[in-house]
Amino acid sequence: MSTAAGKKIAIVTGSALGLGYELARQLIAKGWFVAGIDFNGARQAELSKTFAADEYRAFVGDISDESFVKNSVAAISKIGHIDLLINNAGQPSFKVPTAYEAADVD
């Protein structure tokens, strides 16, 4: 089990690549513990080797799966208090902003 060892804890979704990866990397460089969530299992495995266990813990899954999110948050909460959520993961949508229903963004 990873330990945050007194560090602030951030959850970064979409952490495997791109902006999510860079946000996670920057937080780790500033002394944060990052719980990275992404569906890219191969890349998450690489990141688990790149960063130390007291810097990063990978969670592989889809944030649209409510049970996955609940289980991940429960596991992260056992590491320590969650100080920051960067909800970077998303699904492309091609609607104009006024065409969204509440269920689309829930």
Q: Which ranges hold each PLM region?
A:
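Canonical Rossmann dinucleotide-binding motif of NAD(H)/NADP(H)-dependent dehydrogenases/reductases
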Residues: S2-F33
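Rossmann-fold scaffold of SDR-type NAD(P)-dependent oxidoreductases
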Residues: T13, I82-G90
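Flexible cofactor-recognition loop at the NAD(P)H-binding site
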Residues: L17, G90-S93
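Conserved glycine-rich Rossmann-like NAD(P)H-binding loop of the short-chain dehydrogenase/reductase
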Residues: K30-E46
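The beta1-alpha1 cofactor-binding region of Rossmann-like NAD(H)/NADP(H)-dependent oxidoreductases
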Residues: A42, V60-N71, A102
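Short, conserved SAM-binding/catalytic segment
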Residues: L47-A53
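Conserved mid-core segment of classical short-chain dehydrogenase/reductases
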Residues: K70, P92-D106
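Glycine-rich phosphate-binding loop signature in dinucleotide/nucleotide-binding domains
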Residues: A75-G80
